[in-house]
Amino acid sequence: MMRNFIVVMNILALTLPFLAAEVQNPDSNCREKNEVVYDVQRVLYTPVSSVLNRNHYEPIYYHYRTSVPVSPYAYFPVGLKLLLLRSPAQILKWQPMPNFPQPVGVPHPIPNPSFLAIPTNEKHDNTAIPASNTIAPIVSTPVSTTESVVNTVANTEASTVPISTPETATVPVTSPAA
């Protein structure tokens, strides 16, 4: 009984969005609603393999669309909802939709590389760069470190808490002076 209930609820959960969409969007072929007609046509698929094999470092003159991975030698019915403001008799039966991109405007030329700054082999004056001594003498400087020493005193009259007193020691550290 519980299994049947779960199956029915899953079926309802999967079909309710589709039923709600049909109720919200009734058939638009009614002539009373703004005279809008939708048509489904077949589209001619034109493959171009050079788009897939193009070098990515070439200049891009056109906006490329991705190719559909299907057989290039067959016609595929594609459901297109075309907004028709004229009679369906004026629409062509076949509309070729190429797979390769169409030019969007005037292609932009590739700039000549003459505007790039190319270094020459001319020798420049070295007097502008002052000579500096990169070897610095090593000077030892004393660095004080603090070490904590724990002294435990065995006094029966005092508490048993250990007493810690810091001791300082001077350790010479060598470092290069700038």
From Swiss-Prot:
Annotated site location: Cleavage: 115-116
Family stated for the protein in its record: Belongs to the kappa-casein family.
Organism: Rattus norvegicus
Name under which the protein is recorded: Kappa-casein
Tissue specificity statement from the Swiss-Prot or TrEMBL entry: Mammary gland specific. Secreted in milk.
Gene Ontology CC: one annotated term: extracellular space
Purpose: Kappa-casein stabilizes micelle formation, preventing casein precipitation in milk.
Locations listed in the record: Secreted
Residues with PTM Phosphoserine: 159, 175
Keywords noted in UniProt: Glycoprotein, Milk protein, Phosphoprotein, Secreted, Signal
Residues recorded with modification Phosphothreonine: 120, 145, 165
One biological process term in Gene Ontology: protein stabilization
Signal peptide segment: 1-21
Glycosylation sites: 141, 146, 152, 159, 174
Cross-referenced InterPro entries: Casein_kappa
